[in-house]
Amino acid sequence: MARTVIAIVDDLFFASKIRGTAEQAGVAVSFPRGIELLKEAVARDQPSLVICDLNSQRINPIEVAQALKANERTSHIPLLGFFSHVQTELQIAAEQSGFDRVIPRSAFARFLPQILSGTE
């Protein structure tokens, strides 16, 4: 079964970078545009990873983490959030809400191939 990743990303540059890197790695990726679409995608795809831009305006990343971690069918899915390195309060909030990993945007970009392939 192919690795599947769901990405919650508003920034078109990062979405394009994720899509291109996923294609090269043979990883299926989807970009739901709302909380209901996210829930449907998670139930349908049972992703290996959910990536979330912690600055997303479309979907509240803190609510995403709380909802996924509270549901026994989705609580095992790893959540990775990325943020601007100066937003330490956002990092703390994400960690407290259930994100398994929270990394600066620069590290996310640098290690994207490994993150998507599950080797990092």
Where in this protein do the model-derived segments appear?
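Conserved acidic segment of CheY-like receiver
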Residues: 3-12
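Short hydrophobic/Thr-rich beta-strand motif most characteristic of the beta2 strand and flanking loop
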Residues: 26-33
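Acidic, metal-coordinating helix/loop segments flanking the phosphotransfer/catalytic sites
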Residues: 34-49
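Conserved phosphotransfer microenvironments
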Residues: 52-68
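Conserved phosphotransfer cores of two-component systems
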Residues: 69-75
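A short, hydrophobic beta-strand element within the central beta-sheet of small alpha/beta folds
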Residues: 76-85
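Alpha4 helix (beta4-alpha4-beta5 surface) of REC/receiver domains from two-component response regulators
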Residues: 86-101
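Output/docking surface of receiver
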Residues: 98-110
